[in-house]
Amino acid sequence: MAAAEAGGDDARCVRLSAERAQALLADVDTLLFDCDGVLWRGETAVPGAPEALRALRARGKRLGFITNNSSKTRAAYAEKLRRLGFGGPAGPGASLEVFGTAYCTALYLRQRLAGAPAPKAYVLGSPALAAELEAVGVASVGVGPEPLQGEGPGDWLHAPLEPDVRAVVVGFDPHFSYMKLTKALRYLQQPGCLLVGTNMDNRLPLENGRFIAGTGCLVRAVEMAAQRQADIIGKPSRFIFDCVSQEYGINPERTVMVGDRLDTDILLGATCGLKTILTLTGVSTLGDVKNNQESDCVSKKKMVPDFYVDSIADLLPALQG
């Protein structure tokens, strides 16, 4: 049963048939796609997804890719898109379609730390996140393993800190540790130090319906220790959409957000006035949609897409007709 039928009066979240897709695409210039769980799972493309995106390009549609994953640079994501068959520009402009949280976090810190002499950030994250920061003039420390120093709390409290750290940035960090958490807290106790999280995704979809813990788990740990909230860059934050809009000159009324998560992709689209499509190849399910439709919570009712598809490969009949 379609979620719209299950949700009573809420007419949103109808299956995107070929006929509906043709009508929708006639009124759309730009399609923004999440990546993990939408285009691919791990290193495997969703069947039919590359063909669908190549067909959209052939129709003259402008594509953008908005990912909360901070473990890759824009250039690395552009290379993965080409490697898995999704097409896209080559050469110096290859990465311009990609808006990842590593890149957008760098833009945010460049704004917030403008005028600061030799800005520096303590990064709980990947070399890619550090590289994007350094590309805009923000030095980074902290990337990589950081074992406990000393025998107990007194030693941990007095472990040396880098001078002039003006922000703690929390991204996806497979080396996250108690020592890093303690250092982050100590930096955040210094006056004026910012706390920035790349995203709040609680888990990441991989192949065969499996998941791993996401960045949101790490951000929450730092927030709890510091007793303050982080500035969040990724979806559903408006900031990441503003990054896209400034570079693309988007008309929201002629733009679609396609994603697999109600609480990030679909909520971002609803907040920014975009049409939304949920694909069922990732995290959220039609059961989740039904729960949101039937909820009395206003914020949950925003997390209901206009349309849904089993996979973005479902767009192919509309594009080939």
Curated annotation (Swiss-Prot):
Function: Glycerol-3-phosphate phosphatase hydrolyzing glycerol-3-phosphate into glycerol. Thereby, regulates the cellular levels of glycerol-3-phosphate a metabolic intermediate of glucose, lipid and energy metabolism. Was also shown to have a 2-phosphoglycolate phosphatase activity and a tyrosine-protein phosphatase activity. However, their physiological relevance is unclear. In vitro, also has a phosphatase activity toward ADP, ATP, GDP and GTP.
GO MF: ADP phosphatase activity; glycerol-1-phosphatase activity; glycerol-3-phosphatase activity; magnesium ion binding; phosphoglycolate phosphatase activity; protein tyrosine phosphatase activity
Top-rank taxon, per record: Eukaryota
Tissues in which the protein is found: Detected in all tissues including red cells, lymphocytes and cultured fibroblasts (at protein level). The highest activities occur in skeletal muscle and cardiac muscle.
Positions bound to Mg(2+): D34, D36, D260
Essential cofactor(s): Mg(2+)
Subunit description: Homodimer.
The reaction(s) this protein catalyses: O-phospho-L-tyrosyl-[protein] + H2O = L-tyrosyl-[protein] + phosphate; sn-glycerol 1-phosphate + H2O = glycerol + phosphate; sn-glycerol 3-phosphate + H2O = glycerol + phosphate
Its EC number(s): 3.1.3.21, 3.1.3.48
Organism per entry: Homo sapiens (Human)
Protein name, as recorded: Glycerol-3-phosphate phosphatase
